[in-house]
């Protein structure tokens, strides 16, 4: 079967691309492995006490850059509600403020018998937990961090439930599930559900896509799946696709924890730097996490010294928040590639290391299978 435009994945990214093609009268087909009630952007499933728990995230591979979320909301006639000024301005749980997320988290813990023993080998993120949640176990921390990271991706269509418009944060009253269903209503007949992609190959005419039902030849291919689905298919061989997958499958995300000797009175938030896309999170008022993520600039990033990256971050902080930080204000910095799970540090960096972390730098625990005195395999601790 020959198709002009073939889209893999009917989540918000795939549906948005289909929406644009449909408006232009282009012929296309969308392949979706789930049923018509696919619902959310995508979910990660993990099991606790033989019970499967779904965690909602968003498509990580490819997003449209042609239209802003506000234009799309207007086009779909979706309602937005301003965020009250006394609320936190960052949404880490889709469509909810910190307080609402806290309620959802409590409900989740109750569903899981409110037992931390459900998460063996994981500890709480104490500093962050005291300011946001009563307790914050590793799995939920990973959930929040993933969601927050995805929702502040500078390259995305901004498929989040909250969006900033002229300094004011808005959220979609109907929720993302409603948005996803509404955007695909005009072309439901062009979405082939219950279809699993088995392989993708480059051909002289375009791409050959094999599914569990048929074989398709496409002139143009749009891969709009999450990273976990992408791992099951050999997309990595495709030109201009590997860089997106590498963002989650290789060492192109560098995370740096910066410990300062002074307090910074700045709220939590996402910071986009001049040099490359950076996601900054305040762990405490003296401890900051900076994630450098840009597959395109990966080679340049790897060739830069950590100190140079930190200086770039300091410049951005000073410019954005009118601060007077210098490199001399940095006491420690810890770096590592976003490589294995989402663990970062243990209380003692690794066995035999004589340099101790400051007491207020207890970020998270270790991934399963790692020793208690082991941190990131490729992490390094530097003392200035």
Where are these regions (language model features)?
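Glycine-rich FAD pyrophosphate-binding loop
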Residues: 22-48
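Central helical "cap/lid" subdomain
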Residues: 202, 214-267
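Generic structural signal for small/hydrophobic residues in well-ordered secondary structure
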Residues: 38, 73, 129, 183, ...
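N-terminal Rossmann-like FAD-binding beta1-loop-alpha1 element of flavoenzymes
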Residues: 2-30
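Dinucleotide-binding Rossmann-like beta1-alpha1 core, especially the glycine-rich loop
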Residues: 50-119
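Active-site/ligand-binding neighborhood in enzyme catalytic cores
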Residues: 113-199, 203-206, 224-234
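Active-site substrate-recognition segment that forms the wall
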Residues: 243, 251-300
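Conserved flavin/dinucleotide-binding core of flavoenzymes
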Residues: 16, 206, 279-384
